[in-house]
Amino acid sequence: MKIILIMGLPGAGKTTLANELAPMVNAKRLNADEVRKAANDWDFSEEGRKRQAKRMADFALKLKEEGNYVVADFICPTPEARSLFPADYIVWVDTIKEGRFDDTNKMFIKPDKFDFHVTSQDAKNLAPKIYELSLIHI
């Protein structure tokens, strides 16, 4: 069982792509906004984002240990936040140059490592391609 991370700026299309991809791999879904809401933790400072990455990692690992594939979508704006999340396959959704929130735009560092680079908001056509390529890694 593997964990697929779909990351990028807010509004880039991460959730839409995750919603298309998850059923293809019969995966459990983790959405960062839903996890934050359940934890009632709206701290978007660097420390808050690390805490969120650890929280997402804990949920993802638990689901993986239960025998599930996991598709998680969240911003994961810094290398440190990404290092805290145990992704087996990374999809970078790079469809916009600036997101909705200035603090996130300032904090966001483009990833050095990723397995699939999405540059257009075309989830219905891209999800099958990502699925096929992820089979090599999954």
PLM regions: where:
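Hydrophobic anchor at the beta1->P-loop junction of P-loop NTPases
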Residues: 6
